[in-house]
Amino acid sequence: NKPDDPNLYHIGSALDVKLHGLLSRISGKQGYFSHLATRNLVKYIEKIKPDVVHLHNLHGNYINLPMLMKYLDDKKVPVVITFHDFWFITGKCMYFTTSNCEKWQEQCGNCPNLQDGNRTWFFDKTEELLKDKTQMFSKTDKLALVGVSKWATDEVCKSPIARYADIVKPIYNWVDISKFYPRDIKKARDKYGINGFMAIGVSSIWSERKGLKSFIELAEKMPEITVVLVGTINEGIELPKNIITVPSTSSIDELAELY
């Protein structure tokens, strides 16, 4: 549904997202479709004439990256990219750590992660995709690359794309201290049956790349502590007895109580 807030713009449609996802899987190229949706977005950007465009996650089957970047480059619009993952600096991977792949630091190809994230059914286009991204961002008039941690920023610096950036720096995820403040710990401990020392992890969906394996190892090595994992976990995964699972929640208050 289109947002009621006039300051928000809804890109494309649900049908376009599904079609983009299908074409991406067939072609092996993510971010090369949604022509009409991107054309309409460009018209909107032309209308509001922003001082800067801030890019976040664009690998959700809804944007044509070459079309968007050509417009921004031609109009010399400054671009900020925040790295919530590493899709912008790889052929297709969001998380290269799962396969310990470092090819993206020079040139992708023969990708070990074709089934990760936006999977491809037939073709490995990662070499072409990274070349395209490098060329696109080399033409950006003013480019800032922002990592959400020091580690992420250090990894971004290893990319060929970083040499075209005017700024590469970390800006850490902020915490709303009006919501996250010391709470009554007894309430949460009683609710979930937590005794003694605890460790907590939060993820919308748990997987190896989100650290699930590390939390399981921690629980096995330290059976005297309680590990609380908030988020969805595959039912087929066997967990140690000292791991407590809490379903995903959109309640800030519930998360704050657990923290």
Please report, for each region that a protein language model flagged, where it lies by residue.
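N-terminal subdomain of nucleotide-sugar transferases
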Residues: 1-4, 48, 73-78, 141, ...
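A conserved catalytic-core segment of Leloir-type glycosyltransferases
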Residues: 1-52, 245
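Short N-terminal targeting/anchoring amphipathic segment
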Residues: 43-63, 78-84
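Donor nucleotide-sugar binding/catalytic pocket of nucleotide-sugar-dependent glycosyltransferases
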Residues: 88, 103-183, 194
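Conserved donor-binding/catalytic core segment of Leloir-type glycosyltransferases
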Residues: 146, 170, 191-210, 216-220
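Short hydrophobic "strand-cap" motifs at the C-terminus of beta-strands
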Residues: 148, 171-174, 201-204, 230-232, ...
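Glycosyltransferase donor-sugar binding loop
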Residues: 202-206, 216, 225-240
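Nucleotide-activated donor-binding/catalytic signature segment of Leloir-type glycosyltransferases, i.e.
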Residues: 231-256
